[in-house]
Amino acid sequence: VLTHAHEDHIGAIAHLWPKLQCKIYATPFTAVLIKEKFKEKHIDITKDLQIVELNGNISLEKFEIEYITLTHSILEPNGLRIKTPAGVILHTGDWKVDPNPLIGDEINSKRLKEIGDEGVLAMICDSTNVFSAGRSGSELDVRKNLLNIVNRLKKRVIITSFASNVARMETAFYCAEKSGRQISLVGRSMHRIYTCLLYTSDAADDVIS
């Protein structure tokens, strides 16, 4: 059961699956990326890849699992409410509370509050930057600052980023459009992510390979 498509969560799946031969559950964008990984291994995963709708539910024997939409730097990050015979477990996956998400849906804070009110036996939580005080900045702030920089520059602009940081990729597309530039993606992972975006969202179509 996959929460989102970052490499540290799905990178080993095509290597492990031949030994496990199990069903894989994922939301649409994550599922498209997984298919691409299995294609590289010449494995047809179609019949074992189960696509779960956003905020959807699945049943696995004694476990009832509910997907909860969160916000992060990639499309379709999900938390999991796992109902077990012993009680409810909340697995957050990776998340970042962004009041102005530039990609995907807003965090389903209403459902998270309901789950908290209902009672949770244990929460398994992403802890990146847990020792940093204050709030994380919004990608909207990055977009504004980056656009100001790009507008001041007259020649080629090179932007580095993790390929799976879809929010940053979208910011780069936005800045290119507003400044009258074209985008050239460099790297196999960048092209893979972009191709998957074309299948599942309204990604920019003015990219130079």
Regions picked out by a protein language model, each given a short descriptive name:
Residues E53-L112, G116, E177-S179, S209:
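Core dinuclear metal-dependent hydrolase active-site scaffold
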Residues F29, P99-R188:
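Cap/insert and terminal regions of metallo-dependent hydrolase folds
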Residues H6, K96, T128:
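Catalytic metal-binding/acid-base residues of hydrolase active sites
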Residues A12-K19, N78, T171-C175:
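A short acidic, amphipathic alpha-helical/loop segment
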Residues Y199-I208:
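Single conserved hydrophobic/aromatic residue that forms the stacking wall/gate
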Residues V1-A26, E114-M123:
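Active-site metal-binding motif and surrounding structural segment of the metallo-beta-lactamase
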Residues T27, I34-K37:
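Conserved P-loop/Walker A NTP-binding site and adjacent catalytic elements of P-loop NTPases
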Residues H4-A5, I65, H72, D94, ...:
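Divalent metal-coordination and catalytic microenvironments
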